[in-house]
Amino acid sequence: MATRFSHQLFGAILVFLVLHPFAAKSATLKLESLQNLEHAQKGDVVNGVHQVKKFLKAFGYYPREINRLDDHFDDALEAGLAVFQQLYHLNVTALLDSNTIKAMATPRCGVPDVNINKTSNGGSNHRVFRIIADYSFFPGNPRWSMYQLTYSFLPDSVPVVSLQVLGPIIARAFQTWANVSPFRFRQVAQGTRSDIRIGFYRRSHGDGAPFDGPGGVLAHAFSPQDGRFHYDAEENWSSNPSGSQVDLESVAVHEIGHVLGLGHSQDRSAIMFPSFQVGTTKRNLGQDDINGLRALYRY
């Protein structure tokens, strides 16, 4: 079955699919809540399948047009699982196997990965925007019209980290992108009008993409020229992570990529890969990240 699925979907999903221009509404999954779903397959009705549909819908793998999320393992769920598995370099079985369940429960960015629409015949249509590279862009390829950008910290941000600590971390994250591009970033005073605005927020915070508390979605950002970049204030943030701590700088480099117009990448070594390993750092750009920004801005 895995081989058949891989061949059927190769042309549609080996390439990276399109991102929705806004951050996803939280629908993250806890590993313990998924254990009873292992080995579920199309046609089954299993308690908890609706949670998987909610997760896949939030991150673009299940049609937005389907509003009733039940426990029936349907065609759309099978197709969405196959796309998810392809993106995460898993064995494409279209089943809820253990590796797929673990991948779904891994902390990640809140920006959707793909965009799947329901077709007129009831199937799913995978919107493909590129064919070769692993990087991706937001729909319409939005970009900044200038390379000199300002950033500031939002005054209503939850005081998770002092600006004395956060300031140098964010400055280094911006410099990581400046080192490989024509972009130059300058911090301005808190509350001052700026191109990019950074803050920590809890749960629902007015942008249509509520956070989910500890674990799950760590942060999200919006496409150019919106400029919003939000951390989930309830995560265990650190500048030198260990154990269950999440690295502030690694997440910042990723979210700044979104602010500049990059979507998620299929390349696991890329900063723009959607999920994160807690207790570790990942602060350096991969070649795919660099190539993506060059392709978007054509410099």
Residue spans of the language-model regions?
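Zinc-dependent metalloendopeptidases
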Residues: 2-299
